């Protein structure tokens, strides 16, 4: 789908949402415009697919403009226009290119409640009921785990370069497994070896009491 911008250059913010909502190279055109007034900053999106055009508008106060709020308004207007042309409501709403729990976990860590996190996903990102419950439940568990960490603990991130399928909100999946399932087992074996080696490097009884000592609880290396 062709994407044209007027009045702004936030292409990535709009394009990643377009890739999520219209992933199959849909024939059509989308125009994302930003109009600056003295009081309001107005985002307008018009999308034409198969001869049918839909439009939507979102605005923020010009005095409140930040990069985040501007991009949010652009994405909201795009989503609300696209929703009118889609056969089903996207379960993850206007989310694109992010982990849904990243938003809700950050909200909870900053003092928000599960209820306000749910409202954030509903009112800002238009996420459906069941997906909101899933995201908030995951974030509550994440925050609980974070609060259990001690000074001698360590949180390790393991990157996975492929996914079983492409999530509906994702605009940058590295690679779906597809016909490459034969690579899964050797990759997991290599990953297990790397985790074991990393564990041995972190688990040093002779070191002082840091994350490199026997007090480190998240690894158990044989």
Regions found by a protein language model. Name each.
Residues 1-31:
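Short Lys/Arg-enriched alpha/beta "domain-start" segment
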Residues 193-222:
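Conserved SAM/AdoMet-binding glycine-rich loop
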Residues 77, 186-197:
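A non-catalytic, amphipathic alpha-helix used as a structural packing/dimerization or gating element
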Residues 153-188:
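Canonical Radical SAM [4Fe-4S] cluster-binding loop centered on the CxxxCxxC motif
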Residues 31-62:
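Amphipathic beta-strand/beta-sheet edge segments enriched in Tyr/Trp
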């Amino acid at each position: 789908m062709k994407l044209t911008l007027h009045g702004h250059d936030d292409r990535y913010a709009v394009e990643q949402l377009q890739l999520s909502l219209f992933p199959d190279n849909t024939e059509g055109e989308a125009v994302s415009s930003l109009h600056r007034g003295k009081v309001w900053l107005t985002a307008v999106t018009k999308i034409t697919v198969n001869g049918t055009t839909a439009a939507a508008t979102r605005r923020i106060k010009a005095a409140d403009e930040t990069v985040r709020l501007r991009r949010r308004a652009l994405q909201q207007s795009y989503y609300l226009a696209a929703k009118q042309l889609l056969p089903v409501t996207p379960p993850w709403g206007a989310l694109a290119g992010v982990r849904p729990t990243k938003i809700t976990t950050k909200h909870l860590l900053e003092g928000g409640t599960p209820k306000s996190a749910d409202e954030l996903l509903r009112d800002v990102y238009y996420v459906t009921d069941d997906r909101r419950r899933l995201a908030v439940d995951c974030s509550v568990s994440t925050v609980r785990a974070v609060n259990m960490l001690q000074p001698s603990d360590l949180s390790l991130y393991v990157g996975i370069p492929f996914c079983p399928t492409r999530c509906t909100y994702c605009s940058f999946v590295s690679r779906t497994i597809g016909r490459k399932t034969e690579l899964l087992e050797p990759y997991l074996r290599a990953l297990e070896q790397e985790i074991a080696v990393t564990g041995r490097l972190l688990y040093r009884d002779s070191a002082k009491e840091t994350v490199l000592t026997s007090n480190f609880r998240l690894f158990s290396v044989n």
